[in-house]
């Protein structure tokens, strides 16, 4: 994996869903889970093309009922990368509760970011708890005026203070299907029940200056303009005394492309949308794309990260 001698790259940002964690639809094309492994808690995934066996962990189901898997080799390679001197940051649009529920199955990291940048956590060894992490409250307070203070998390979204929740109430009154369950600095909108993608675009175009939006798996996320993956990443690299140009990214989806534009190198296990394809076509030297899929693609990328980062050339 990446070694400390490649000083030009010292931070790895890594998306979770579709990048580290893969779901049945993507996995079925490349192989199948045949049963439990001899390793406690693990299952055996057999690649269809090669017959190779991969040990995987099954994550708890998401709030939408999907159950993903992550390969043990992925976890091992990311830990080797950290030992080589690279800071690992997990960064996701998932809600806070989803990230916390999955932590026992995700790689140990140097920072954890959820809700499209709204919440940042770091390991905190002084805490004698099962999951020793502490929130970056300096970062959280930046969103207070728009998303409400942290103590408003326990208040129903329809009653929270802040511009973000004013928009939530306004869209609810207009009949939109919104998802704020367990979100604290973000809510999600889906075009259905007669609403169209054009209707969503009009909402985005008319957002107040203190709000921002991004799309993910066909859904629109809304959050404070002080948040977002790019701003969270900038905050973190400054904490690590680094720069975004010295960071690389593993990702797969629309809402990663803003961050992809500002880091030095990008690794994709798959191309999931037209916008991702356009980004790759516009700057092919920046992107490395696997020709496989699912956990096999992630493992393949991690095996070659050192060469790509060391030479800054496509494979």
Model-predicted regions and their roles:
Residues 10-12, 110, 247:
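The start of beta-strands in P-loop NTPase/AAA+ ATPase cores
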């Amino acid at each position: 994996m990446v070694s400390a001698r490649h000083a030009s790259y010292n931070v790895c940002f890594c998306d979770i869903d579709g990048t580290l964690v893969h779901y049945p639809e993507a996995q079925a094309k490349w192989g199948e889970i045949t049963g439990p492994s001899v390793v406690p808690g693990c299952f055996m995934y057999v690649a269809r093309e090669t017959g190779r066996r991969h040990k995987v962990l099954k994550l708890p189901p998401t709030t939408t009922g999907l159950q993903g898997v992550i390969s043990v080799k992925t976890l091992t390679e990311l830990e080797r990368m950290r030992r080589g001197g690279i800071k690992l940051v997990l960064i996701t649009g998932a809600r806070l509760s989803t990230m916390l529920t999955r932590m026992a199955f995700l790689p140990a990291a140097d920072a954890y970011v959820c809700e499209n940048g709204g919440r940042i956590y770091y390991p905190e060894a002084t805490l004698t708890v099962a999951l020793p992490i502490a929130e970056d409250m300096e970062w959280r307070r930046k969103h207070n005026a728009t998303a409400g203070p942290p103590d408003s998390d326990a208040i129903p979204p329809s009653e929270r203070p802040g511009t973000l929740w004013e928009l939530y109430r306004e869209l609810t009154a207009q009949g939109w299907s919104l998802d704020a369950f367990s979100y604290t600095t973000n809510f999600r909108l889906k075009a259905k029940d007669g609403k169209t993608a054009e209707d969503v675009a009009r909402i985005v175009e008319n957002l107040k200056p203190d709000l921002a939006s991004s799309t993910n798996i066909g859904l629109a996320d809304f959050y404070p303009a002080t948040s977002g993956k790019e701003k969270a990443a900038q905050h973190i690299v400054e904490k690590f005394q680094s720069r975004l140009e010295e960071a690389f990214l593993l990702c797969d989806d629309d809402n990663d492309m803003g961050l992809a534009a500002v880091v030095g190198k990008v690794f994709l296990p798959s191309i999931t949308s037209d916008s991702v394809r356009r980004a790759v076509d516009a700057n092919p030297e920046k992107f490395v794309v696997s020709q496989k899929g699912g956990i096999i693609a992630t493992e393949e990328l991690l095996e070659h990260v050192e060469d790509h980062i060391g030479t800054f050339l496509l494979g």
